[in-house]
Amino acid sequence: MILSQRRMLSSKQLIENLIRYKFHKTPYTRSSIWPFKRNSAVIILLFIGMKGELRVLLTKRSRTLRSFSGDVSFPGGKADYFQETFESVARREAEEEIGLPHDPEVLHKEFGMKLDNLVMDMPCYLSRTFLSVKPMVCFLYKDKLEKHEDKYKVPLDIRKFFGKLNPGETSSLFSVPLNDLVIHLLPEADEDVKSYQAEYFERKEYKLNWGGIKWLIMHYHFHVANNNEMPWLQTIEDLSSSDEDGVDGGIFRFRDLWGLTCKILFDVSCIANGLMDEKLKGELGHEDLIVGLHDYGNQMQPNGRSEWEIGMINGDRNLKYSDVIPEYYMKHLLECRSLW
């Protein structure tokens, strides 16, 4: 049973909740929710920080990329061939982007680390460029510890780090605490919550109408200079220029965690903290919408983006999901949830 959130949980408890989590089995086929040439996967890489907190590794996309340039994201990318699994996609792309070895023997022998898969059945999410994004959640830790329990407590101290940037794809690597995403939802009466100091300096959210559907948009702003950052991450050269980051008060550079990356990470943090009841679990991901687009709307097809998709991506306010999805199915989507 997943622990309910009545107090701030330890990193071990957060991980145990993630391991226990089971997404309801999707009634859809793989080709409907993860259609070829529109399918991508990302890896959510968790590890123990300097204060024993659970942190997540994030990247900043290169400005040279055509889509989501300069955005904060997870390591990941698109599938190369039809039968490629989402795990293979995420691990292959993570090796290309940040140097995370796909081979567990290499990770063990050369870097002294192990990687546990925690959640492998997260639902698919829809990106603004009409890709189906499948996340996997993993935990990275040192493999030579005195006790098994230490992997949940001992900070990930890396003397030889695999991390390297692919200048064409990634401009920087950094991390944030997983609990930062939901600390505002935890009970203020709890002493640990009262004393908790989030690393973001600003959080905001608003509703955005995109295609006749309301979307919850969240932003978390983190200063680039962070005393809580892991030393081994600080040794990696930041290839991003100062004009790629936001500037707080005209002085301090910051990174903006928002969009789909923020949505997925928020959901993972909710699961870890036991904040995901059955209703919210049913609202995870965007599989119903992806099916509506692919199966009923003839969108997200392998032969390139449609004129409708291009218009939606470019923000044409005259376009709606109801232009391509049948009325009865749109009614079903809007009855499922009021906010996406």
UniProtKB/Swiss-Prot annotation:
CDD domains: NUDIX_CoAse_Nudt7. A motif (Nudix box) lies at residues 77-99. It is found in: Peroxisome. Residues 37-199 form the Nudix hydrolase domain. The keyword Hydrolase applies. Mg(2+) binds at residues 93, 97. Optimum pH is 7.0 for CoA hydrolysis. Optimum pH is 8.0-8.5 for 8-oxo-dGTP hydrolysis. GO terms for cellular component: cytosol; peroxisome. Residues 1-7 form a transit peptide. GO terms for biological process: coenzyme A catabolic process; DNA repair; nucleoside diphosphate metabolic process. Belongs to the Nudix hydrolase family. PCD1 subfamily. PANTHER family: NUDIX HYDROLASE, PEROXISOMAL COENZYME A DIPHOSPHATASE NUDT7. Present with 238 molecules/cell in log phase SD medium. This is Peroxisomal coenzyme A diphosphatase 1, peroxisomal.
